Amino acid sequence: IDLLARNIRSALSRLESVKVRKVQGRIIVDIDDSDMQEGLERIVRVFGIVSVSPAAVIESRLEVIEQTVEDLVKPLDFRTFRVSARRADKTFPMQSMELARHLGGTVLRAVPDITVDLHDPELNVQVEVREETYVYHETIQGPGGLPVGCSGKTGLLLSGGIDSPVAGYMMAKRGLAPVGIYFHAFPYTSDRAKEKVVSLAKILAGYTGSFKLYVVPFTELQLEIIEKCPERQITILIRRYMARIAEAIAEKEGLGSLTTGESLGQVASQTQESLLVTNEAAHLPVLRPLIGMDKQEIV
């Protein structure tokens, strides 16, 4: 939870007056109303978060809770509801079920022509009583997964296509912090392709909090391979040299693996035999999270 809180702070670092704190298994983010929308957009991309709920933070006094619940429900359009209460602070005089029933009465008195539905309500008013009380009704799904960095770091071989950033996203979701590695071989790869990779790196940074990108000049080596090697071996040799260079970067950065966007049989160079030959050039494990997917699934 410490790492997750740190990742949330990183995601919100550009916003002012943000405070991230841990409260009994929850992470509470105090944020100005003016920054709420942007803050939510950033938080719901942080891996390790299951859900986010914008909440009113109030005193743990019954009359304050009642008034807050009433103010919350009056503007809303609903016909069925329930109140879910959780009393984490055992000094509060009412137990959870008793508080839920009491606040249900508050809602019934505040809004006409509504009924209680405990199983499938249109509105679920949630109240958590701790040292302070949180009142909310909206739950926004997060990406889930593990906090980025808890599983170590991986070298992500970026190409400019959709496959490699999706692979990086998937490994980040399992707690690996990706470090981008892009091989630029002008004129075989254009400057526009490099700009696209930089753009993809920025998008990934929105999920990982930060993203270091290595741009490796590869033209000279690629020309040597093309000039001196049999044509049918060129692609495999290029991939083997990329793997070796990526391993050198991995040693410098303390990476525990390499990640690629390869998918079995998607192109001629991605057969079992070709992947085996590429693997033999690397000592680190090569992770291929897209290996069993086709292009439609990846997109």
Positions of the model-derived regions?
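Hydrophobic/aromatic beta-strand patches that form the interior of the parallel beta-sheet core
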Residues: 125, 179-181, 214-216, 259, ...
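Conserved G/P- and acidic residue-centered "switch" motifs that form tight phosphate/ATP-binding loops
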Residues: 161
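Active-site adenylate/phosphate-handling loop in enzymes that bind or generate adenylated species
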Residues: 102-107, 113, 143-151, 218, ...
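A conserved beta-strand->alpha-helix junction
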Residues: 201-228
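Membrane-targeting and insertion segments and their boundary/processing signals
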Residues: 39, 43, 167-171, 216, ...
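Proteins with a high burden of low-complexity, intrinsically disordered sequence enriched in S/T/G/P/A and R
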Residues: 1, 64-66, 71-72, 267-271, ...
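RNA-binding accessory domains that recognize and position tRNA/RNA substrates
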Residues: 1-155, 165-211
